[in-house]
């Protein structure tokens, strides 16, 4: 089959959005093949320009960076310099509002009204002790203020995902002093375990956790391996994520 897809760079979190319709059962296989062809890619989503726009990640998880990228793709299709969109995204119970605006340098600034987490709990996890877990519909994020050796973190992610009963899990290594955040994301349905350059839902989880911890609204700028994401959060779950997106190229291949 011929497949058309676009490559995006949202804060280093290299993302493929497939524009050709693909049956849901085939999406993990197609995603795995595309990630072989584009080895710097960290995730794959399947895009439909309907009303609202639909975005399904290969593992059925939620992804804020891919949501922002989908808004950029829709703006490019409309030949628009700015766009306010509502996007139906896997792993989110309700459609997600997103806005993007093109910058003179060619990249886009985007904001996404992130879904409110279902819960924040403290969970006893092997190798980490009692740690906060921020649970979204499509992913659970574990906030870790103490480092773990990378091999241990990579072994722990699948076990913790199973223990939490989550569709996907993020291990968020947070340095409160510097604002540094290093995310490791495991998505079993897609068969991926990735040290991501940035993680939008992980950034949101940290913002919400800090707002609840401090009992007041916070604005956090989190420095990640691929760049900076900004989250404005309050304890009631109003969560606005801001980041940058570059559209790299669009390809059509036989697969």
Language model regions located:
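A glycine-rich beta-to-alpha transition motif near the start of alpha/beta enzyme domains, typified by
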Residues: 1-108, 142-255
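Surface-exposed beta-loop interaction hotspot
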Residues: 112-155
């Amino acid at each position: 089959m011929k497949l058309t897809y676009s490559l995006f760079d949202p804060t280093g979190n290299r993302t493929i959005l497939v524009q050709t319709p693909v049956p849901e059962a085939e999406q993990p296989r197609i995603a795995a093949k595309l990630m072989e062809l584009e080895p710097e890619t960290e995730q794959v989503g399947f895009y439909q320009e309907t009303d609202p726009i639909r975005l399904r990640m290969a593992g059925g998880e939620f992804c804020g960076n891919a949501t922002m990228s989908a808004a950029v793709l829709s703006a490019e299709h409309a030949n628009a310099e700015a766009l306010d969109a509502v996007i139906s995204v896997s792993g989110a119970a309700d459609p997600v509002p997103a806005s993007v605006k093109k910058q003179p340098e060619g990249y886009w600034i985007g904001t996404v009204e992130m879904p409110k987490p279902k819960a924040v709990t403290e969970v006893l996890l092997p190798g980490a002790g009692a740690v906060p877990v921020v649970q979204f519909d499509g992913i659970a994020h574990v906030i870790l203020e103490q480092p773990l050796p990378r091999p241990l973190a990579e072994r722990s992610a699948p076990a913790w995902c199973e223990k939490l009963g989550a569709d996907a899990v993020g291990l968020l290594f947070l340095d409160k002093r510097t604002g540094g955040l290093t995310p490791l994301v495991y998505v079993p349905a897609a068969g991926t375990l990735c040290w991501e350059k940035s993680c939008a839902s992980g950034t949101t989880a940290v913002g919400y956790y800090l707002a609840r911890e401090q009992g007041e609204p916070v604005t956090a700028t989190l420095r990640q391996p691929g760049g900076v994401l900004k989250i404005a959060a309050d304890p009631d779950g109003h969560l606005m994520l801001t980041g940058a997106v570059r559209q790299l190229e669009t390809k059509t291949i036989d697969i």
